[in-house]
């Protein structure tokens, strides 16, 4: 059983619920695999329809079919999608993404406000009886609108903790002031902001310099109480993906990964097999070669 740090803004009456949710997300390992499904807003239809993308992916339900048959910690997506499809996928572990913006809003100075508040998510969880394990929110560090998003994120973390809900913050350097959003030193700084906000987990993009020094700067910024997840990014070579995740988690000490396109831009059978191979690396400590054999077997 993994030892859980319970933040002091969790009420005594909600601590066991928070602990159960953390254990469900991490499968009692302290590590986390998020299946990211917020891109239908973030990337519009770019990720879901094209010559190299299976037609399966054009249907929003494809994400739910994958999530329902894969060993993920949680499926992160918008509440509206969960409300539409959740009755058919009631066993899926969900993380509600509270804000999203389309990629038509460029990086000059992005702003993404919350669509719902935590109280509404808690009410939805109670009424729907779905397995809502947490909430998520993106902060664009460096944007002119940073102050507004940081304030909103702080309120979300506090309110979520009051409900016993863990919080995953997407911490992305963006804006005219940012010269290189993939700079490891800058990403580590964004982690600092997320930790100060009280996030339980922080999702960041990979640095452009993938040396151990760069990764360690980012991961160390999370300290001992905040888990760092690296995004998978655009679809990549299978061996590279598995090797990268293993290295990030089991050599450098990251908490896990959040993958979207690398999973859902496959047929249903292939997507489920790939998700379970990633889970074997993150949760079971399987080597990339063993995970690849598992994938090919399925």
Residue ranges and their predicted role:
Residues 13-22, 59-62, 79-81:
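Short alpha-helical segments and helix-capping/turn motifs at coil-helix boundaries
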């Amino acid at each position: 059983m993994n030892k859980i740090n319970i933040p002091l803004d969790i009420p005594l009456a909600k601590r066991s619920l928070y602990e159960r949710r953390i254990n469900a997300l991490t499968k009692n390992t302290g590590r986390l695999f998020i299946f990211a499904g917020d891109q239908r807003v973030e990337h519009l239809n770019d990720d879901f329809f094209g010559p190299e993308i299976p037609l399966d992916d054009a249907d929003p339900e494809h994400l739910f079919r994958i999530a329902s048959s894969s060993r993920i910690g949680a499926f992160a997506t918008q509440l509206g999608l969960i409300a539409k499809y959740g009755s058919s996928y009631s066993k899926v572990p969900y993380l509600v993404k509270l804000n999203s913006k389309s990629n038509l809003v460029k990086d000059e100075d992005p702003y993404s406000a919350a669509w719902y508040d935590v109280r509404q998510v808690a009410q939805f969880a109670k009424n729907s009886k779905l397995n809502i394990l947490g909430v998520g929110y993106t902060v664009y560090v460096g944007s002119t609108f940073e102050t507004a998003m940081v304030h909103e994120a702080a309120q979300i973390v506090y309110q979520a903790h009051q409900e016993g809900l863990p919080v995953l913050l997407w911490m992305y350097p963006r804006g005219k002031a940012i010269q290189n959003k993939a700079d490891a030193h800058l990403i580590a700084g964004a982690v600092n902001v997320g930790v100060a906000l009280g996030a339980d987990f922080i999702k960041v993009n990979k640095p452009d310099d993938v040396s151990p020094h760069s990764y360690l700067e980012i991961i160390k910024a999370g300290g001992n109480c905040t888990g760092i997840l690296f995004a998978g990014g655009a679809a990549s070579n299978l061996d590279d993906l598995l090797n990268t995740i293993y290295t990030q988690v089991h050599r450098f000490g990251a908490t896990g990964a959040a993958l979207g396109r690398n999973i859902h831009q496959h047929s249903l059978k292939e997507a489920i097999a790939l998700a379970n191979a990633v889970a074997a690396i993150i949760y079971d400590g399987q080597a990339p070669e063993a995970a690849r054999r598992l994938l090919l077997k399925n």
